UniProtKB/Swiss-Prot annotation:
Keywords: Aminoacyl-tRNA synthetase, ATP-binding, Cytoplasm, Ligase, Nucleotide-binding, Protein biosynthesis. GO terms for molecular function: aspartate-tRNA ligase activity; aspartate-tRNA(Asn) ligase activity; ATP binding; nucleic acid binding. One of its GO terms (biological process) is aspartyl-tRNA aminoacylation. Belongs to the class-II aminoacyl-tRNA synthetase family. Type 1 subfamily. The gene is aspS. It comes from Beutenbergia cavernae (strain ATCC BAA-8 / DSM 12333 / CCUG 43141 / JCM 11478 / NBRC 16432 / NCIMB 13614 / HKI 0122). ATP binds at residues 219-221, 228, 490, 542-545. This is Aspartate--tRNA(Asp/Asn) ligase. It comes from the Bacteria. One of its GO terms (cellular component) is cytoplasm.
C-alpha cells in the first residue's frame, strides 16, 4: 500500500506516530512561510503542515499527494471541532506529488463544494470530479450500504441471489425495448430486459423457491422528468406464498433500509385499497404525511342550480387560511390548473368574521348550499375551498394535485416532526385491467389489441374472487397486487402471479392476444406453466427512488454513479453516438431477415 493510515482515521492517540497518507489537496492555506494542506481521501481529511516553502509552492487543489510525517497535537486554540481529526496535524517530512491537476471546472473542496451552484450538465460531464464532493460521494456510499442491508435481510431468509440474462428476446412489457443487433444472426435482434419478470417466474418453476437480484433494467421511454433509460430494482420472488407473506418480507427489507438513516418504520405498514386512495387523495400514490383528504360533494350538489356542478363528479379540497390570499394568487391557481389540462379551479372563501361566502362560485349556489357548505367540507372561518367537477378520474386527479400543492405552500409537509417525516402505505386491490387509451395517456405501450390492457403487467393474478370470472367484467376485476408508497412516491410494486396456463391464456384473450400470438411471444412461459408451476409472487423495489429518498436527493440522478441527463444523453461519454459504416455492416443493422427462417419478434 502507498499509505499506512487513512487520513480520516487519525486521532489524538496517534500523536508521535510516523504515518504515510495519500489523497487529494482539498485546500491550502499559507501562514508566514508555512503551508497548511487539508489532505482528503475517502475516509476524511487530515491537516498536513509543510514547512519547506519550495515543496509547498507548486501544490494546488486536487493534486494527488503521498505525505509522510509525524502526527502532532495542534497548538492550543487551533483545534477544529468540526473535523474528526481536528485535534491533530501531520508535520510532513516527505511529500511526493503522485499527480497534478488541471484547472477545475468547479470547486471540489469540501469547504466550498456544497455551497457553489453548479449546472447539472457540467456536473455530469465531469462526474468523476463531482463525486469527489461530499454530498454526491455520501449518496453513492449510502447506496452501497443499502445493497448490503438488503442482502443481509434476504440471505437471512434463505433467498438465492441469481443473475438473469440481459440479452433476451423482445417481449411486450409496457414500454419500448432497447434492441441489440445479433451479429451472428443478421436481421435478428436481442432486447435488453425491462425487468427480470419472466425469468424470475421461470426460476420459481425451476424450484428455486426464493430468488432475489439487484437488477439492471432498461426502458426506451419518451423523456420524462426524473426517469432514466437504465435503472435498478431490487427484484424478489417467492414460491408457495400469499400476498401477506410477500408484504411481510418486503417490510423487513424496508425497515433495514430506513435504519441506515436512523428511522424505525412502524410495522405492520397500514394498507389502503386503490379505490380509497383515488377517492380520498386523487392518486394511487397518496402522501400521508398530512391529512386534508378530498371531500366528495356529488350528492351534496345533486340538485344544484349551478350548471358547472351538474356533473358526474364534484369534489373539493380545503386550503387552511386560504381566505386571506390576494386575488392574484387565486388567479395563479387558475393558471396552475390549466397547466394540468383543466379549465380552471373553482373556489369559495370563508371569511374570518363569519360573513357570507366569497369567491366567484358563491353567487351561483343556492341559499341552502351556501349555508351548509362549511360543514360539508369541514372548512373553518378563514379557509378557502377549491372545487373540481366533471369526469370522476381527472377531477379527482386535479384535486389530489391541489392537495399536494396546498401542503407545500402552507408548510404542512415541512412542519412534520421526525416521527411524521416518513409515511408509508400499501395500496392494494388495484384494477386488473384498464382501458387501452389510459395506457397511452400515461406514456406506456399498451400490450395487446383489445380495448383492455394490464394495469401492472399481464402476469398479475386476479384476486381469488375474480379468478373464474374476470373476462365477464374486465373493468371491475381486481388484481392480487400491492404497491408500497412512501411520502407520495411509489417505491415498489408486486403481485401474486398467474401460475396456471389456462388463466394466463384467458388474461391474454381479454387483452386481444390470441392463442397463436401468445404462443409466439410467450410460448416459453406458457410451456413452463405446463410442468407443475408453483403458486408464486414477488415484488420489485425501485432502488434509485428509494436511495433518493434516503439521501434527501431531489433527483434519482444524484444516487446513480454515472446517470444520463434529459433524453437519455450522457454528457460524460457523449452517448448515444453514431457508429461507423464498418460497425453497421458487421452488426447487421441493415440486414433484412429471410421471412422463412428468421425468428419472429
Amino acid at each position: 500500500m502507498l499509505r499506512t493510515s487513512p487520513a480520516g482515521s487519525l486521532r489524538a492517540e496517534h500523536t508521535a506516530q510516523v504515518v504515510t497518507l495519500t489523497g487529494w489537496v482539498d485546500r491550502r492555506r499559507d501562514h508566514g512561510g508555512v503551508a497548511f494542506i487539508d489532505l482528503r481521501d475517502a475516509s476524511g481529511i487530515a491537516q498536513v503542515v509543510i514547512r519547506d516553502e519550495a515543496v509547498a509552492h507548486p501544490l494546488r487543489n486536487e493534486f494527488v499527494l503521498q505525505v509522510t510525517g509525524e502526527v502532532s497535537r495542534r497548538p492550543a486554540g487551533n483545534e477544529n471541532p468540526n473535523l474528526p481529526t481536528g485535534e491533530i496535524e501531520v508535520v510532513a517530512s516527505d511529500v511526493v506529488v503522485l499527480n497534478s491537476a488541471a484547472a477545475l471546472p468547479f470547486q471540489v473542496s469540501t469547504a466550498l463544494a456544497d455551497t457553489e451552484a453548479i449546472g447539472e450538465e457540467v456536473r455530469l460531464k465531469y462526474r468523476y470530479l463531482d463525486l469527489r464532493r461530499p454530498a454526491p460521494a455520501r449518496a453513492i456510499r449510502l447506496r452501497a450500504k443499502a445493497n448490503q442491508a438488503a442482502r443481509r435481510v434476504l440471505d437471512a431468509e434463505e433467498f438465492v441471489e441469481i443473475e438473469t440474462p440481459t440479452l433476451t428476446r423482445s417481449t411486450p412489457e409496457g414500454a419500448r425495448d432497447f434492441l441489440v443487433p445479433a451479429r451472428l444472426a443478421p436481421g435478428s435482434w436481442y432486447a435488453l430486459p425491462q425487468s427480470p419478470q419472466l425469468f424470475k417466474q421461470l426460476l420459481m418453476v425451476a424450484g428455486m423457491e426464493r430468488y432475489y437480484q439487484i437488477a439492471r433494467c432498461y426502458r426506451d421511454e419518451d423523456f420524462r422528468a426524473d426517469r432514466q433509460p437504465e435503472f435498478t430494482q431490487l427484484d424478489v420472488e417467492m414460491s408457495f406464498v400469499e400476498q401477506d407473506d410477500v408484504i411481510a418480507l418486503a417490510e423487513k427489507v424496508l425497515v433495514a433500509l430506513w435504519e441506515l438513516i436512523g428511522f424505525t418504520i412502524p410495522t405492520p405498514i397500514p394498507r389502503m385499497t386503490f379505490d380509497d386512495a383515488m377517492r380520498l387523495y386523487g392518486t394511487d400514490k397518496p402522501d400521508l404525511r398530512f391529512g386534508n383528504p378530498i371531500v366528495e360533494l356529488t350528492s351534496y350538489f345533486a340538485d344544484t342550480p349551478f350548471r358547472v356542478f351538474q356533473s358526474e363528479y364534484v369534489g373539493a379540497v380545503v386550503m387552511a387560511g386560504g381566505a386571506s390570499l390576494p386575488r392574484r394568487q387565486f388567479d395563479a391557481w387558475q393558471e396552475w390548473a390549466k397547466q394540468r389540462g383543466a379549465r380552471g379551479l373553482a373556489y369559495v372563501t370563508f371569511p374570518e368574521d363569519g360573513s357570507d361566502l366569497g369567491g366567484p362560485v358563491a353567487k351561483n349556489l343556492s341559499d341552502a348550499e351556501r349555508a351548509g357548505l362549511r360543514e360539508a367540507t369541514g372548512a373553518a372561518p378563514g379557509d378557502a375551498v377549491f372545487f373540481a367537477a366533471g369526469a370522476t378520474t381527472p377531477s379527482r386527479a386535479l384535486l389530489g394535485a391541489a392537495r399536494q400543492e396546498i401542503a407545500k405552500r402552507t408548510g404542512l409537509i415541512d412542519s412534520a416532526d421526525q416521527e411524521g417525516a416518513w409515511a408509508f402505505v400499501w395500496v392494494v386491490d388495484a384494477p386488473l385491467f384498464k382501458p387501452t387509451g389510459d395506457a397511452a395517456d400515461d406514456g406506456d405501450v399498451a400490450l395487446g389489441h383489445s380495448a383492455w390492457t394490464a394495469v401492472h403487467h399481464a402476469f398479475t393474478s386476479p384476486t381469488p374472487e375474480w379468478i373464474d370470472t374476470f373476462e365477464q367484467d374486465p373493468g371491475s376485476a381486481l388484481s392480487n397486487a400491492y404497491d408500497i408508497v412512501c411520502n407520495g412516491n411509489e417505491i415498489g410494486g408486486g403481485s401474486i402471479r398467474i401460475h396456471r396456463r389456462d388463466v394466463q391464456e384467458r388474461v391474454f384473450q381479454v387483452m386481444g392476444i390470441d392463442a397463436a400470438e401468445a404462443q409466439e411471444k410467450f410460448g416459453f412461459l406458457l410451456d413452463a406453466f405446463s410442468y407443475g408451476a408453483p403458486p408464486h409472487g414477488g415484488i420489485a423495489f425501485g432502488w434509485d427512488r428509494i436511495l433518493a429518498l434516503l439521501t434527501g436527493s431531489e433527483s434519482i440522478r444524484e444516487v446513480i454513479a454515472f446517470p444520463k441527463s434529459g433524453g437519455g444523453y450522457d454528457p460524460l461519454t457523449q452517448a448515444p453516438a453514431p457508429i461507423t459504416a464498418e460497425q453497421r455492416r458487421e452488426s447487421g443493422v441493415d440486414a433484412v431477415p429471410d421471412d422463412e427462417t428468421a425468428p419472429q419478434a
